[in-house]
């Protein structure tokens, strides 16, 4: 029997980490590592499996000593923790495999790893598992040809994680997004033709989690849940029946594009199925900047009215906002502050523009000689830029810092909460 250790690197303090609120609610992390739980499902007979999430517990030397192979999955924001894990594996002579968005976008940074997985793994996972079984691991596994059918994805191994330590569970229904935002890395990794699981497959995964006894919040992690509206409507119709039969054990939230506001049927299906919140990439209230960034879907209707339409349906809107675009007007910080207040989006992720690897933005800035040599941190809230901005950098960073302080000043934050509750969310 071979021992396979799955290790999830630690997140720094970011918007998505929620580290400072965990002690208040008796939890240790927001979400379990879905990718590793899914990869683990391919390892069946002949393997002992263990998963260590460094966000809820320490990776001990004893864990590494136990392992025959160490498998990791990471995003770029986890890079510091990941490279520490790789170094420890090397020191102890343990083969370490690195996959996920970070190695996919920056494979050149993984010379210390035994093997890297670039891209989606479904197409070659059976070979990968057999190579581990036979101790003949290749240095690189990479997708060739078409992107994989999600019907190949197995049910995640929720039994490998300590469910009680997380605020929310998560599953994936689709990959890819039909839009073409210049700064986005999702369309580079997953493509612009959304691929989905079948309703039956997705509900079977829900059954697997339901059978663990978990009840509560549930994040559907799709980068654009409504990328294929026909498929998502069919799934939601089945999900409504499932929720009713089970007594509505899960409260869902997800990420979507703002054109959700123009589809009353979809809004009704989502709220009926038990969705209570949606994260939207709002980016900026400046229409010219949206067009320059390729975010044309945000310009076809009033952004503020679209947000209120979604809120009035019963979905709280949380949003992502960006400053640092080339075409930002001089008064962008005041525009953002006013828009966030009027739109009643208290839970706003405001960040500096970041040029992520292998994006249209990075390619353009490279051609213009504006990329800095430093690797992107993946954290757009640490007051650093990995490119030379049009605006004076000191002015940009200070304006961003003040914007952040303004929108999260208690008076402004709770004012937005009050506006949302009293004037936009429906009364029940």
Where are these regions (language model features)?
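Structural recognition of alpha->loop->beta junctions
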Residues: 108-127, 269-277, 335-350
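Acidic, low-complexity intrinsically disordered segments
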Residues: 2-214
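Radical SAM [4Fe-4S] cluster-binding motif and immediate context
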Residues: 152-318, 325, 329-338, 366
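Mobile, glycine-enriched helix-loop/loop "lid" segments at the mouths of ligand-binding/catalytic clefts
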Residues: 143-148, 360-383
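Radical SAM enzyme core and accessory elements
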Residues: 2-6, 13, 45-51, 63, ...
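Short, solvent-exposed turn/loop segments enriched in Gly/Ser/Thr/Pro and often Arg
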Residues: 55, 102, 223-227, 256-259, ...
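Conserved beta-strand positions
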Residues: 6, 72, 220-222, 280, ...
């Amino acid at each position: 029997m071979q021992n396979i250790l799955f290790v999830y690197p630690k997140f720094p303090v970011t918007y998505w980490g929620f580290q400072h609120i965990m002690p208040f609610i008796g939890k240790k992390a927001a979400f379990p590592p879905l990718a590793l739980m899914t990869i683990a499902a391919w390892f069946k007979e002949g393997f002992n499996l263990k998963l260590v999430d460094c966000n809820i517990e320490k990776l001990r030397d004893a864990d590494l000593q136990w392992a025959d192979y160490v498998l990791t999955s990471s995003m770029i924001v986890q890079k510091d923790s990941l490279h520490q894990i790789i170094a420890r594996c090397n020191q102890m002579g343990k083969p370490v495999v690195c996959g996920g968005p970070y190695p996919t976008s920056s494979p050149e940074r993984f010379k210390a790893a035994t093997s890297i997985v670039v891209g989606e793994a479904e197409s070659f996972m059976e070979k990968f598992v057999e190579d581990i079984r036979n101790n003949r691991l290749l240095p690189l596994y990479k997708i060739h040809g078409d992107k994989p059918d999600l019907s190949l994805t197995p049910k995640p191994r929720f039994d490998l994680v300590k469910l009680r330590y997380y605020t929310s569970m998560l599953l994936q229904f689709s990959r890819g997004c039909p839009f073409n935002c210049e700064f986005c890395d999702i369309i580079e990794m997953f493509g612009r033709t959304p691929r989905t699981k079948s309703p039956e497959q997705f509900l079977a995964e829900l059954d697997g989690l339901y059978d663990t006894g978990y009840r509560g919040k549930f994040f559907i992690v799709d980068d654009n849940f409504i990328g294929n509206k026909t498929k998502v409507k069919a799934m939601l119709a089945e999900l409504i029946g499932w929720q009713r039969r089970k007594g509505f054990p899960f409260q869902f939230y997800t990420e979507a594009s703002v054109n959700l506001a123009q589809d009353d049927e979809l809004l009704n299906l989502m709220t009926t199925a038990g969705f209570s919140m949606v994260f939207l990439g709002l980016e900026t209230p400046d229409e010219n900047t949206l067009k320059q960034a390729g975010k044309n879907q945000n310009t076809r209707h009033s952004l503020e009215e679209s947000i209120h339409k979604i809120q009035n349906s019963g979905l709280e809107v949380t949003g992502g906002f960006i400053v640092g675009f080339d075409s930002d007007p001089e008064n962008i910080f005041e525009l953002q502050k006013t828009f966030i207040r009027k739109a009643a989006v208290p839970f706003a992720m405001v960040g500096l523009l970041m040029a992520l690897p292998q994006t249209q933005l990075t390619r353009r800035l490279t051609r213009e000689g504006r990329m800095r040599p430093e690797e992107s941190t993946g954290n757009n809230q640490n007051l650093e830029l990995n490119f030379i901005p049009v605006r004076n950098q000191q002015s940009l960073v200070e304006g961003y810092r003040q914007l952040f302080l303004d929108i999260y000043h208690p008076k402004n934050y709770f004012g937005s909460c009050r506006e949302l509750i009293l004037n936009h969310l429906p009364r029940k």
